[in-house]
Amino acid sequence: MRREVVVGTRGSRLALAQADWVIDHLRARYPRVSFVRKEIRTTGDNILEVALAKIGDKGLFTKELEQALLHREIDLAVHSMKDLPTGLPEGLVIGAVSVREYPGDVFISRGGERLEELPAGAVLGTSSLRRTAQLLAYRPDLQVIPVRGNVQTRLRKLDEGVVDALVLAWAGLFRLGLTERVTHRIPVAMCLPAVGQGALGIEARADDAEILEMLRTIDHAPTRAAVQAERTLLRRLEGGCQVPVGALGRFRDGRLVLEAVVASLDGTELVRAQESGPADRPEALGNSLAVRLLEMGAGEILARVRAGA
């Protein structure tokens, strides 16, 4: 058993909180091992004035961490699962998927208004095309603008009046102890979350048996299955992190139910469907629902989104 394990993470407060969650849980199981946190800046951290969709989405928040893994500078990398591309570099695997926090989005307004109470023309801030598309389908009279930066930066822009309201993931606010800022949760029936939202993905080298054995102790099998179905669907749709695709896998009566949506950027076109399948066949379920969405016109919607990006 090695004496030291180097844990790679981005440097934001949220990323550090997530890395500390992993370290705390591993340390409880391996008290004789020293877990050292190493902060690594990513492309997405360095480019803050450009909308994510215009930069491209191939590992914006993960590539540098993966390179550090491959160069053996770190032993594992902690990611927000929603940031992890569906295709991993050769030699790397997802060693663990954490138990999932509430996966949905939340609405935060400066004046305490709910989403349905915002006046026409109000400015809503989000960096996500997925959120933009689904929320415009519900409230086409709102003005949606991109808001980049960490959670604290976005909240500051709200407080300063740059926007009237924000949409953020519940999980990030929860991990930062900021849930008192939430006006209300947005029902997933209105806005499906990003693939993997609410879960952490811990990446490791495929040939590092010792680290993979450690990570098995914090792997949450139900979350892994749900996320695997979601990621398979996204891969089959040839989507990425910066496309208007939402998906959520949940367990009902012992079966895995997968629901997904594909929408145009302005919310005027939207296809949504769900299917269920055996819990031990998440990839088959993801592929099946993706094919159904493509038959409903999802491919044409995504092609138009990519052409306009």
Swiss-Prot record:
InterPro entries given in the database record: HemC, Porphobilin_deaminase_cofac_BS, Porphobilin_deaminase_N, Porphobilinogen_deaminase_C, Porphobilinogen_deaminase_C_sf
One Pfam family named in its UniProt record: Porphobil_deamC
Matching Gene3D superfamilies: Periplasmic binding protein-like II, Porphobilinogen deaminase, C-terminal domain
Keyword Ribonucleoprotein belongs to the record: no
Co-factor(s): dipyrromethane
Keywords: Porphyrin biosynthesis, Transferase
Enzyme Commission number(s) from the entry: 2.5.1.61
GO biological process terms, semicolon-separated: protoporphyrinogen IX biosynthetic process
Catalytic activity: 4 porphobilinogen + H2O = hydroxymethylbilane + 4 NH4(+)
Additional detail: The porphobilinogen subunits are added to the dipyrromethane group.
Protein name: Porphobilinogen deaminase
Organism: Desulforudis audaxviator (strain MP104C)
Gene, per the UniProt record: hemC
